[in-house]
Amino acid sequence: MARLIFVLGNPGTGKTTSLRNLKKEEVAYITVTGKELPFRSTINPVQVKSMDDVHKAVVASKKSIVVIDDTNYLFTKAVFGASEKDDKWDVYDKASKDFYKIVEAILNKDTQQNFYLFGHLEDVESKTLALKTLGQATRRNNNPEGWTNIVFESLVDMDEFVFKVKTDGSGVKSPMEMFDTETVPNDLRVVNDKINKYYKGDK
């Protein structure tokens, strides 16, 4: 089964730059905003405009690592791109259901792919880590982080860009003994290898 992994954090904390050591042959980079990569790379970004586009990309993806960047803006596009004639509750409800379809498509894949969903925080002042989704429909009906046991936080610690990786009650979580330290450098190649080795029973 494919794995769903969230990497959440404030803008500019090193989520996208964590791809810097990956090659285009091993990663599919799906961007919601269309922003160019913040480093020199041969990785070819694939821009999507809707949750339906993401769903199709997930189903069609073959590469072992798939990154969906700025996931939270899928909700922004769904809500602010809707017609003013649409019932607002229906708009939020549809966004919630469409996002669930993406999660379902990932978890239903009979592959060893790792899907990383990068996103901003719901509330930067909150002590609980959560994906920004707009409105309450998604969080009430389909708590995104509940579908996985791997949620990382991107942050800057002592001028170093890192991922917070060990379960600590804040919403950050990972399986027992997957990581030896509270934080790791924001290098997705290293992190991905660590996850794969863990599930293969290697150290």
Regions found by a protein language model. Give the residues of each.
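P-loop NTPase motor core
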Residues: D70-N143
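Structured loop/turn residues at beta-strand edges in well-structured enzyme cores
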Residues: S61, T111, G146
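Generic detector of well-ordered alpha-helical segments enriched in charged/polar residues
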Residues: D52-H55, N72-F75, D93, K97-Y100, ...
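Conserved P-loop
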Residues: M1-S61, I65-V67, N72-Y73
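Phosphate-binding/switch region of NTP-binding enzymes
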Residues: F115-H120, E125-P185
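P-loop/Walker A phosphate-binding loop and immediately adjacent motor/lid segment at beta-alpha junctions
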Residues: R40-V46, V54, E160-K203
